[in-house]
């Protein structure tokens, strides 16, 4: 997989356009990251190169020693509920989003055409294909041939709280 400074720059511009995540209101940090996209992307890429130059064992040790600041926030969920959201430090949000864009770019050709979530293909400042959305997913699902059979059922679930329920120890040891 190829990672470049451009991946981090694109992440900074996307954060500046859309905010840090889809559960929190737009924060002034996002505009600051966008305005300093070149500076921050350079810092992120320098860090990436330093980690990438280490052996796998040393890189894992280095990353495991990092402290990534985060806040746990109660955010509205629907019209009558709340959920816990984790907001990581803006720098780490940018760094991880840059790596995410590099991974997505490398993997996009392998993804099913039936997938609708966060597909690359947009132009700056939003790099995601806005024609792929929750709404288009639901419309495509309702148009499925299999649903025309008598007794067909659609089961809809919400996995937005999955992070709270996974066993993190296994993830830490991957």
Describe the predicted segments one by one:
Residues 1-174:
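Conserved two-metal-ion catalytic palm core of "right-hand" nucleic acid polymerases
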């Amino acid at each position: 997989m190829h990672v470049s400074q451009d991946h981090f720059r694109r992440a900074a511009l996307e954060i500046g356009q859309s905010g840090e995540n889809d559960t929190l209101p737009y924060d002034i940090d996002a505009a600051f990251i966008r305005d300093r996209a070149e500076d921050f992307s350079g810092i992120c890429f320098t860090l990436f190169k330093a980690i990438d130059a280490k052996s796998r064992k040393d890189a894992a040790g280095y990353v495991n020693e990092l402290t990534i600041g985060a806040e746990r926030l109660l955010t509205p969920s629907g019209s009558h509920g709340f959920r816990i959201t984790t907001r990581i430090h803006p720098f780490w949000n940018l760094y991880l989003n840059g790596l995410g864009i590099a991974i997505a770019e490398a993997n996009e050709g392998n993804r099913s055409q039936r997938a609708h979530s966060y597909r690359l293909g947009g132009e700056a400042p939003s790099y995601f294909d806005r024609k792929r959305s929750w709404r288009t997913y639901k419309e495509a699902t309702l148009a499925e041939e299999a649903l025309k059979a008598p007794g067909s059922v659609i089961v809809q679930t919400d996995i937005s709280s999955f992070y709270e329920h996974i066993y993190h120890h296994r993830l830490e040891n991957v």
